Amino acid sequence: MKLFIYFFCLIVFLSSSICVVHSLEPYCVLKNRLNLINNLYVHFVQKINFCNMKEIELIRGELWIKRPNLFYCHVMGSQESFLISDGKTLWFYVPTIKQVTAYCLENIISNNVFLQLLFMSNTNIWQDYTITQKKDWFYFKSSYDDGKHIKQFKIKITDRGIIDQFSIIQENKQHIDYYLSNQCVNLINQDKFCFTLSDDIQLDDQRMKF
């Protein structure tokens, strides 16, 4: 589940935080490009590889994002699932077993270093990363090797706000790539990000278990 949150958080944080340090100029350029996006719909393909680059998992789906904190991800295929943020609760729903897990969005952020990095407007956190730009690619590399930081991540976004790809390299050398297509930035109705709990769905409520 957390793999889908990374992309969402990057857009939310970078689009809302403030550029205050000249040495972070590539970050400011990226922020300005992401500021072109208030609503986002894309098709995505997620590929997960280990260090030998052997593909181990391929996932397809659709993604809706509405700033500042609304998110709807539909994973297609035999393992269909939905990940929905209504701004307060993060719902993870698996229709084949009629079960939904509810998480407090704030708690998810506070218990994950990567999500703290992406949600909190704290320039000291960003100083833990070296940020560089090469054309439409923006690269983030951790200054630490402590297992607490995402080792590297990168995003490709044009000066028109079109996001093509987003990648993460974790400490265990796992490589996660997202390929995006059919991007649309039209207004998304707020109702899209609501989850209705019906009587036939089993609830696993984790909102108070942190």
Swiss-Prot record:
Quaternary structure note: Monomer.
GO biological process: lipoprotein localization to outer membrane; lipoprotein transport
Family per record: Belongs to the LolA family.
Domain of life: Bacteria
Gene: lolA
Keywords of this entry: Chaperone, Periplasm, Protein transport, Signal, Transport
Subcellular locations according to the entry: Periplasm
Disulfide links within the chain: none
Signal sequence annotation: 1-23
Protein name (database record): Outer-membrane lipoprotein carrier protein
Keyword Transferase in annotation: no
CDD domains: LolA
Coiled coil spans: none
Role, per record: Participates in the translocation of lipoproteins from the inner membrane to the outer membrane. Only forms a complex with a lipoprotein if the residue after the N-terminal Cys is not an aspartate (The Asp acts as a targeting signal to indicate that the lipoprotein should stay in the inner membrane).
Gene Ontology cellular component annotations, sorted alphabetically: outer membrane-bounded periplasmic space
Residues spanning the membrane: none
InterPro entries: LolA/LolB/LppX, OM_lipoprot_carrier_LolA-like, OM_lipoprot_carrier_LolA_Pbac
Cross-referenced Pfam families: LolA (PF03548)
Keyword Transmembrane: no
